[in-house]
């Protein structure tokens, strides 16, 4: 099993470039010879892949969406896991990272908003020392996906699910694009209020899904999600109520 990671003690240790683990892959995954590209052969599931080594808190995992396939609902999932892929038989991997792998192991992942996973987009994601999972697309602002990743006590591997509309992805070197590693994550108050809806990228995010509390959606998109799947696209919790944020609502029309 992997050893404990200490960012303070190992900040200057050279890191091996990230690639996909060659053996622990979903049943529909095909990797190229360099293990930098993962493609889902068919259907919409069985696309789980892992990084070949543990990832440090704050380290960016960067990838490019190579191919988008219409006809499915939802796309790429990203996150982190304490599950060492070297100890996992590919035949034992479930079809989905959310919720299957999360229920079977200490794994924390989230669905990326639809606008993130268009072909050609560069996505990077990371977890900070507080256990907050962030992602951003191209040179955009960071989006807080969840706040419950356990970063102490065991290594974390990056996990991705080449799911649904996302047909193929390619891992990139974060150092090749300065914007990937630049900038600190925004405070929670800036991430979760008053921004554009992360689904339509047009209307103001003024609606909160309950009970999970994610509030990165406009009212129209939130109700569409509620009627379609009734699960939060960020954390997959069951939606029981859609609530308009009072602070945003009071400012409408002013």
Swiss-Prot record:
EC number: 2.3.2.27
Tagged with keyword Metal-binding: yes
Catalysed reactions, as listed in the record: S-ubiquitinyl-[E2 ubiquitin-conjugating enzyme]-L-cysteine + [acceptor protein]-L-lysine = [E2 ubiquitin-conjugating enzyme]-L-cysteine + N(6)-ubiquitinyl-[acceptor protein]-L-lysine
Zinc finger (RING-type) residue numbers: 197-236
Chain ranges of the NHR domain: 17-174
InterPro entries: B30.2/SPRY_sf, Neuralized, NHR_dom, Znf_RING, Znf_RING/FYVE/PHD
Pathway recorded for this protein: Protein modification; protein ubiquitination
Chain's role: E3 ubiquitin-protein ligase that plays a role in various biological processes such as lung development or innate immunity. Seems to utilize UBE2E1. Promotes innate antiviral response by catalyzing 'Lys-63'-linked ubiquitination of IRF7. Also inhibits hepatitis C virus assembly by directly binding to viral E1 envelope glycoprotein to disrupt its interaction with E2. Plays an essential role in TLR4-mediated activation of MAPK pathways by promoting 'Lys-48'-linked polyubiquitination of the phosphatase DUSP1/MKP1.
Name of protein: E3 ubiquitin-protein ligase NEURL3
Organism: Rattus norvegicus (Rat)
